[in-house]
């Protein structure tokens, strides 16, 4: 009888402690392989996901918000943690070219699987990877009945830095990313482009950026609050013309949001966190990928001694290009880039980019003959493709143009988008622009 009573009491205690155990699982930590960086992730009492980062006993990022807002609902609160999953990887991979041949990819991973407690009970996973010299995280929208096609209207991602460190940044401009770099405290910044290079203290340098941007809007950040002397940066994405930020369909993954962490500024140059967060190269045979220096016909246009458009000062002529090819061959340059060779420059090309033709050369420019001449000298032309921002016109000619260049033995193309907008309405760094750049890469 007494044994039965104790058994019942034990069961009651177990059930009483079960909610506490479940609450304890609403937060977890993951450390880098050496243990020097530790990331904590979880959800608060309102079900809002967050993360923080420490280096040893030093706080780098205070609890910072995570999540998304959609056109038909919110994915930034009312969550519970379904489970935490862990993984680790330690591998070496080889670059076709770069500062070093072999790169070590060593990290510990924590996946926080979330489900909303009410309403549609949508699911969202957040994957964290912690390296010895930085960390990254991304959002994963799993396949689910309650989420098919969706539109992101705001990304709630924040980086809440300890203190108000100084940073080198480029100001955000919807048309061009060509401002001047400035150094100032984060609290004094407006909306800025990434990367954001941060000097927190003499032995703490960081770089905030993104990785694996394939079908998403480009990341910018801006300070949204300074509380207790700590600055909070929030993600600001480049929109479509109608205000949408990202158009997607589950299953779907976001780019990585990343922070490299170094003791010295120079360490940011050799930091490989961003490279390691990108997908492995999809090109199986990379033996043909080589580096090379080039010269070209373009600076004389800016000096106003020659012109892009045909006329008495036309720079892209057969005779002039041969001079550059001879110079390149004599001085060890592998390529010659020629601007103004193709039809379209005779128009107001900043407004009429849709009139560019990427296979038809001006009469005074022997395109195929010049490439044969260059090859005989151990040099090659680089095809210059200025679009004037007319992305659709370029996409419609990609197959024909690239087939011609390949047939001629041209191995490199330099594209251009000199315009505030793409196709007269979309920002170059929006999802629209990112999708276009991917089409060009894949066609090449």
Region spans (language model):
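Aromatic- and carboxylate-enriched substrate-binding clefts and catalytic-loop regions
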Residues: 339-444
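Conserved, mostly hydrophobic/aromatic
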Residues: 139, 328, 416
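Short, flexible loop/turn elements at secondary-structure junctions
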Residues: 116, 130-132, 163, 262, ...
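Intrinsically disordered, low-complexity acidic regions
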Residues: 240-242, 283, 322, 334-344, ...
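Bacterial Sec-dependent N-terminal signal peptides
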Residues: 1-27
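Generic recognition of flexible, low-complexity loop/linker segments
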Residues: 125-126, 244-247, 323-325, 401, ...
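N-terminal accessory beta-strand-rich subdomains and adjacent acidic, glycine-rich linkers
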Residues: 27-284
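An acidic-aromatic substrate-binding cleft motif
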Residues: 249-327, 331, 335
